[in-house]
Amino acid sequence: MDERTEGQLRLIREVISVTQAAGVSVWLFGGWGLDARIGRITREHGDVEFWLEFMHAERSKAVLVEAGATALATQPPAEACEFTWDHVPFSTAYFDRRPDGSFSQPRGRWSDWLFPPGSFGDEPGTLDGTPVPAMSVSGMLAMKEQFPRLRNGRPWRQKDINDIEILRELAAAL
């Protein structure tokens, strides 16, 4: 395992520890979320991404900064916050729960993004032998499949196409 990956794993453990101590639940998504659902590290990652409920946005930012992260003013505050911690980039994005059990990001550019019930559950993934909270397979698959059709979406990159194939295989095995 290279130094960058070790730093990202350390950051994942630290963010989870700090937010859980503050009563804030987070879920990995993106490449690290997929790796957690697969149960092993499959590739290098450019950053670490977490979802959390919008009502915890300010509290999460405050406890992460207090613990040593630096918040960056690079994203609309109603949507997400980007950080660095010991030179490792990461972000928190925000969702809201809907009455039907699904989830959305109703504020800002991604208001047409919808995630199915169960996207943010209690079943952990695994990274480097450690259980970690991760967005569900069905949630990540919905997220990836919808992206090109969103109002502000973009075409899939090759890594998105590869991720969708893996997520479909994982979903079929559930």
Regions found by a protein language model. Give the residues of each.
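Compositionally biased terminal segments of proteins
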Residues: 1-174
